[in-house]
Amino acid sequence: MAGSTTIEAVKRKIQVLQQQADDAEERAERLQREVEGERRAREQAEAEVASLNRRIQLVEEELDRAQERLATALQKLEEAEKAADESERGMKVIENRALKDEEKMELQEIQLKEAKHIAEEADRKYEEVARKLVIIEGDLERTEERAELAESRCREMDEQIRLMDQNLKCLSAAEEKYSQKEDKYEEEIKILTDKLKEAETRAEFAERSVAKLEKTIDDLEDKLKCTKEEHLCTQRMLDQTLLDLNEM
């Protein structure tokens, strides 16, 4: 009975030990699985760390390149800002120049209008002088005809005719000058403005020439009248002499 109890006790103990062994083996397997899981987790973590390190390195390299690009961009930005400042200053200078040019153009337009007005006035004076010259030329031609008729009758008029021819040459030269001035009036407004005073001076000279020519014509007509009277007196004396000779 006691032996049976001992066997039972031994069996129970063996069962307990077997259970403990199974439990231990199960725990060992579980621990092995945990160890294996931890190993895989560690390997995965190490791989992730290595990947992170590579990513960090790539990020650092990318950061370096980004910093270089940033430095380049900042430098370009600074240059662009300087260029923009210079452009702005240039624009201000151009705007100031444009404003001055506009003011200058307005002034030139005013001067151009004044020059046109003065030129029109000068043209009017010139046309008036030219008409007077035409009239005087006609009078001079008629005077020349009368002078030539008087020359055929009286040789004393040769000197006066020579003077009249000289005056006629002067008149032709003056007419040529007026023709040249008329061509100059058709030049550009700027040249007209620059030479306006000269044109007015020439117009005044032409008026003085006209006055001189009119006086010359008057003098020639007076001299022609005197010559006719002298010729008439001479003719009367000649007729009287012939009459006296016939009576003798």
UniProtKB/Swiss-Prot annotation:
- InterPro entries associated with the record: Tropomyosin (IPR000533), XRCC4-like_C (IPR014751)
User: Per the database entry, which stretches of residues form a coiled coil?
Assistant: 4-240
What spans are recorded as compositionally biased (Basic and acidic residues)? 27-42
Task: Name any GO cellular component annotation.
Answer: podosome
| Listed GO MF terms | actin filament binding
Question: What the record says about its domains?
Answer: The molecule is in a coiled coil structure that is formed by 2 polypeptide chains. The sequence exhibits a prominent seven-residues periodicity.
- Subunit relationships: Homodimer. Heterodimer of an alpha (TPM1, TPM3 or TPM4) and a beta (TPM2) chain. Interacts with TMOD1. Interacts with TNNT1.
Annotated protein name in UniProt: Tropomyosin alpha-3 chain
Q: What's the encoding gene here?
A: Tpm3
